[in-house]
Amino acid sequence: MELAALCRWGLLLALLPPGAASTQVCTGTDMKLRLPASPETHLDMLRHLYQGCQVVQGNLELTYLPTNASLSFLQDIQEVQGYVLIAHNQVRQVPLQRLRIVRGTQLFEDNYALAVLDNGDPLNNTTPVTGASPGGLRELQLRSLTEILKGGVLIQRNPQLCYQDTILWKDIFHKNNQLALTLIDTNRSRACHPCSPMCKGSRCWGESSEDCQSLTRTVCAGGCARCKGPLPTDCCHEQCAAGCTGPKHSDCLACLHFNHSGICELHCPALVTYNTDTFESMPNPEGRYTFGASCVTACPYNYLSTDVGSCTLVCPLHNQEVTAEDGTQRCEKCSKPCARVCYGLGMEHLREVRAVTSANIQEFAGCKKIFGSLAFLPESFDGDPASNTAPLQPEQLQVFETLEEITGYLYISAWPDSLPDLSVFQNLQVIRGRILHNGAYSLTLQGLGISWLGLRSLRELGSGLALIHHNTHLCFVHTVPWDQLFRNPHQALLHTANRPEDECVGEGLACHQLCARGHCWGPGPTQCVNCSQFLRGQECVEECRVLQGLPREYVNARHCLPCHPECQPQNGSVTCFGPEADQCVACAHYKDPPFCVARCPSGVKPDLSYMPIWKFPDEEGACQPCPINCTHSCVDLDDKGCPAEQRASPLTSIISAVVGILLVVVLGVVFGILIKRRQQKIRKYTMRRLLQETELVEPLTPSGAMPNQAQMRILKETELRKVKVLGSGAFGTVYKGIWIPDGENVKIPVAIKVLRENTSPKANKEILDEAYVMAGVGSPYVSRLLGICLTSTVQLVTQLMPYGCLLDHVRENRGRLGSQDLLNWCMQIAKGMSYLEDVRLVHRDLAARNVLVKSPNHVKITDFGLARLLDIDETEYHADGGKVPIKWMALESILRRRFTHQSDVWSYGVTVWELMTFGAKPYDGIPAREIPDLLEKGERLPQPPICTIDVYMIMVKCWMIDSECRPRFRELVSEFSRMARDPQRFVVIQNEDLGPASPLDSTFYRSLLEDDDMGDLVDAEEYLVPQQGFFCPDPAPGAGGMVHHRHRSSSTRSGGGDLTLGLEPSEEEAPRSPLAPSEGAGSDVFDGDLGMGAAKGLQSLPTHDPSPLQRYSEDPTVPLPSETDGYVAPLTCSPQPEYVNQPDVRPQPPSPREGPLPAARPAGATLERPKTLSPGKNGVVKDVFAFGGAVENPEYLTPQGGAAPQPHPPPAFSPAFDNLYYWDQDPPERGAPPSTFKGTPTAENPEYLGLDVPV
């Protein structure tokens, strides 16, 4: 199958101006140099195509013609749309004297509009018989050819051809022809006569004086494209081609673009015009459709009209083919996604497929219309071992039994021997032939072993010829009325070498006697084209079963159609008048006027009605309405099938009365209680207002901050059991342990932070500060405190995180992490930091090592050793000293010790970089002293290989020098939530689709599960439930009992924020910071993360609670299961030792402006963090808490120095937790004399330095 066949045009008729003669438009061919499909009928094929034709819509190919071929049918051709090919002919003349223009819309070998090749015997051939003239083309005789719009000329190997070298081809080529090539061979075997003396310049197409070349370009005056003479007044109109007879665009011999009723135009008139007066688009009565180079009032038959005014063979994208009632076909835009259609060979995904095979036959299952063609070649039934294609089995051909229409052609050159006909296409009605085989045939059957055709439903061959030849067993070819199938006079049947008709008749292979006019597709009454009597289904019959036989029938247009099954057969008369139940003469069972029915309706609901209908049959079989029309609970029926009368019993009345009285009493009691409670509330509020007015002794100075209603759970040491050490530092040790609450038969795995003996009061104070911070947060993505044990050494109890820290997790599972994992973690960290921003908490130490992994899909921010709460009037925090992570800090934090939420954004960008590099060290190999200069010069961390520019640009925005230019955390939440829904678009990991799923464990995780006593444990979040009386203004007596027994009840929360849930501030409730804003415009963290996290604690609320809170989702793209938990207590992650000592840097003394601690607040006042605050310059409040050395986490330790002797030797494990990530801004003094050095000291490790610039 040739792809060029898609461009073949069917035989069509286009009209010239009124009163002018009709222009016959015919199809071209697309065989190129291939041998004819049927050499015996090749000349007949050309004659049928071009007889009387004037415009060839395609290519004019004249090949393999014998010497005696009569080609007079070509003499009317004036225009060719494609190319002209004259090749491999023995004929001496080709009468194309009237051909004026070759447009070259298709080109031979993509370059040539005129190709004349191998016409005649080769030059080295033997001499022909004496007296016989050698065959071959002798003269072109294209005396009228004056225009080739596109393409060149190729004339090669024509030994008898003369005069081709005398033609001035430049004059014929259009001035804009970019392919004006001429390859002309002048070798010939005979002597040529000179041109006639009448020919100027000896330029001619033959030796006659009529064959002189007409020049219409090179002789023109300047500026003319074509002319009729050398004078300036002889110029043709710019829309003319091939010359003219006058200066107007109606005097053209051919049109350059479009012929509109004999006038050459640049465009055809539009179908719609715009009315500037009414501002409306109006139909244009002069509008025309574009068809080839002509403007037509309607698209020719078999073509599709479009809304843009063109005639096409295939509808454009998002359009569908529609057939109007008058039979015209057009393309209509789909109002919704176009319905799926069946494509055939040469279309869409089957464009390069040659034949129907077992590999693609299922593409046609259930298809009624195929847009394309069907071809069956020997390879279809032989199979192809090279492509592992099995042979096509005969039973597989049954998929075509539903086929009714083919828009292309049907070509069959191979068929199973077991099938005597083509009856698998018995329902095929139309072969449109918009695409033709070799540009000529819509139906081709050759070399088959079938005995008859069997195409009993075929009614139309829309275009092209039918070729049936070399089918040695085929009969019934002449019994088909082919003329009734064709749609234009240039179509015909070409048949040769089939079984002789007399042999067929001799063997009884003739049409059935019931076939009208002896027309049939095969033997038997089912193969008739039309029936002489009646048609029942697909079979011709002598009479219908109107008066006898079952089932009874009625006659409609000589078709026998069955009566309805409920019609009673009549003797000697008709039974029905139509197919419906209301068209019966008598009913077989019952009649529910006007329909015959099998039974009367009993409780049947008619269409569009909710009221059932009950009927019963009377003595005559007619359905009558029942006296009672029951609507529900119709159980009891009488002997007629009608509902029995329902009588209410006395017991029912008594029960109804009692229930009514009780309902009234209950409602009265309820209303009385409500009224009494309302009066009590009014009395209580009045008394409280009066007492406040008389007892206030000093004015109120409210801060506007929300009260911190978090609760601290106090645990006893007997409830805790330490299992093994997870890590140690200079100030304490982290244990894996089990919490066994008193009176509860549960074991909860926990992490226990224990301060060392003889630690300084400052260390105790700072671990309590960390406990204060951890207890006050409540987000699914931030670790919270489970409790605190106030023994001689303070112990913090948090939930055990079995997967360890995120930094180790990504390093261990580098090859098993996907883009969705990384983007989900980035989104969850951003949500956690957004929550901390909303509660005015500056973390100051955000890094991958300080993010714990609860599950591969859930991470939490931890390690609040450096975190600081901002007061209600604070916007930033200035640190006094201590150890800080230099390579994660923003530039203003390094230079001015200024920490804000936007400096946390900088750290967030570095954390994302760590994830995207699978745990690489930022600025690895660069000393810490060089980091400030490096950042000020504009250098930043490089783009990770797996990151797209979208993700990297978010990191770059986080590292802007101006903190106000960095994105807010809520913006980062939005960005990474969007990316997490389409992860592979933003993070590119090689072979991600082929890799394993996300890791489910880690080395740290496996080490935590090694102990035998860790079995049968209960997760802390499953154990903790809301406590009683959390927000109750008037707690019940005894509410201060056991801490872990106060979780049995809750109160409700109304909209607007006036009342809050009576829940313990556990993982399910997010208590507000004492400095959190009290305005109504809350954070989306509270609306989303808090609300979702609270759902688990709300399980004990009353069922009428209207709270809109819902659970949060760990994965933004996957709905959260009901059993999924989202909260994890923190577990400190200890990375490899990366600390360095800075012994020469001394701490800064406290500011003398800082005053003593404020007096304790009275009982019942709002809980606030104890703080030592004093106003500084510009009203900035500074916190005198030190940076480092406040917690037992070894990542925050100030390393031991060697400047002075130690009273006690350091522990053996202490150096193992020196962390190079942290920079000691204010190390403790070692007993050496105070240093007066003002600047950057020299240290043992030049990568990490301390700064002593005062704040």
From Swiss-Prot:
GO terms for cellular component: apical plasma membrane; basal plasma membrane; basolateral plasma membrane; cytosol; early endosome; endosome membrane; ERBB3:ERBB2 complex; membrane. SUPFAM superfamilies: Growth factor receptor domain, L domain-like, Protein kinase-like (PK-like). Expressed in a variety of tumor tissues including primary breast tumors and tumors from small bowel, esophagus, kidney and mouth. Pfam families: Furin-like (PF00757), GF_recep_IV (PF14843), PK_Tyr_Ser-Thr (PF07714), Recep_L_domain (PF01030), TM_ErbB1 (PF21314). Residues 1146-1155 have a biased composition (Pro residues). Changing residue 655 to V: In allele B2 and allele B3. The modification Phosphotyrosine is found at residues 877, 1112, 1139, 1196, 1248. A motif (Nuclear localization signal) lies at residues 676-689. The active site is at 845 (proton acceptor). Residues 1035-1179, 1196-1255 are annotated as: Disordered. Disulfide bonds join 26-53, 162-192, 195-204, 199-212, 220-227, 224-235, 236-244, 240-252, 255-264, 268-295, 299-311, 315-331, 334-338, 342-367, 475-504, 511-520, 515-528, 531-540, 544-560, 563-576, 567-584, 587-596, 600-623, 626-634, 630-642. Residues 23-652 are extracellular. The keyword ATP-binding applies. The keyword Nucleus applies. It comes from the Eukaryota. Glycans are attached at residues 68, 124, 187, 259, 530, 571, 629. Its EC number is 2.7.10.1. It catalyses: L-tyrosyl-[protein] + ATP = O-phospho-L-tyrosyl-[protein] + ADP + H(+). Belongs to the protein kinase superfamily. Tyr protein kinase family. EGF receptor subfamily. Homodimer. Heterodimer with EGFR, ERBB3 and ERBB4. Part of a complex with EGFR and either PIK3C2A or PIK3C2B. May interact with PIK3C2B when phosphorylated on Tyr-1196. Interacts with PLXNB1. Interacts (when phosphorylated on Tyr-1248) with MEMO1. Interacts with MUC1; the interaction is enhanced by heregulin (HRG). Interacts (when phosphorylated on Tyr-1139) with GRB7 (via SH2 domain). Interacts (when phosphorylated on Tyr-1248) with ERBIN. Interacts with KPNB1, RANBP2, EEA1, CRM1 and CLTC. Interacts with PTK6. Interacts with RPA194 and ACTB. Interacts with PRKCABP, SRC and MYOC. This is Receptor tyrosine-protein kinase erbB-2. It comes from Homo sapiens (Human). The lineage of its organism: Eukaryota, Metazoa, Chordata, Craniata, Vertebrata.
